């Protein structure tokens, strides 16, 4: 028993060392987004709607970057574990190139079709005008955004989580300063309104991408650019990244019919859902996603070292730590939900609904504590299909299916929605546990590593 306790303490120290910079990075990203929303809300309702609609399309390059980032962290952590520096450098080189190439079409689409894309969603003329301008600028930054995400994840795979935090922090501070100054026209800056918010995003993403590329090109960090000539790496990057992209898009697309379902119960119920979700994300996302990233790093590196049994033990220990932390967060969020909601709305009906939604989400924090380390372990091994299946099952069968049947068909109203939300996240855990227990994720990772090793030896 004492040995188990010491083992958990040892892995907990490693998790904290790797995880706190990731948590800070996530907090800064959330803060940047919150500032954008607050500044935009000072313009007009049309501006808020314009940014909201444009962000629906901006999810696509974001998901591409996150997908390639998952591929990068899996391969770079595995190659770090086996000491294959050249192969690891080829991973980041090819991931950055693929990311930049994937982002270029969005620049063209933004220049030509930005207004049409906003109009396609049925927006009014002023919303189309503002949303088109904002989307054009955001899409212009797509290659840079993707490169920044890939660069951060690649470095994290080596075990360096502080440098991405610093670079991302610099970019976010620049973004926030420009958003406030150019958006509101304070200090000596011109008042550009919504264009200023877009320019802040563009400049911030540009700085982030240039800092990562400059770091890799200088060879001063753990990663550097190598001649991109490995077809095996390209194939593995795409095979790992693809399901993660689909995972993110399935969740984003499911939000459209789910919001339509919520609107049946009134604007207040819909607004309350978004308030509860925003509070939940602000409080839990930095922590849960940190556990996912850290588990990916440890899993990939340990598999690269050729210690598959140690991987399973580490995952179990991180699972216990994550579940304990998020359970405590769940309890805290449940207790303080009412005062938190009061910061977002003064309407009594909206506040009443929002408190309930926040408490429902707080219960889901327990599922997040279980799911994210399991998903991180699978992703670190290169298995992104199982987390994709988990999310797809959750959003289609539970988030949409269960919610609709219980709330509309059986007439339970919002109670059916609450059950649908909780069951969604429980289903994620169910599928992830099956994947960890019965899937061949360790064997598949060893096969991927072996193929990269053979290719290196043949050259």
Regions found by a protein language model. Name each.
Residues 123-134, 138, 142-170:
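Cytoplasmic helix-loop-helix junction between adjacent transmembrane helices
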Residues 17-37, 137, 148, 201-208, ...:
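Transmembrane helical elements of multi-pass membrane transporters/channels
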Residues 23, 27, 60, 64, ...:
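Residue-level signature of the transmembrane alpha-helical core
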Residues 1-19, 76-141, 191-241, 299-364, ...:
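Short alpha-helical transmembrane segments in multi-pass integral membrane proteins
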Residues 48-108, 145-157, 164, 272-335, ...:
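Small-residue-rich hydrophobic transmembrane alpha-helices
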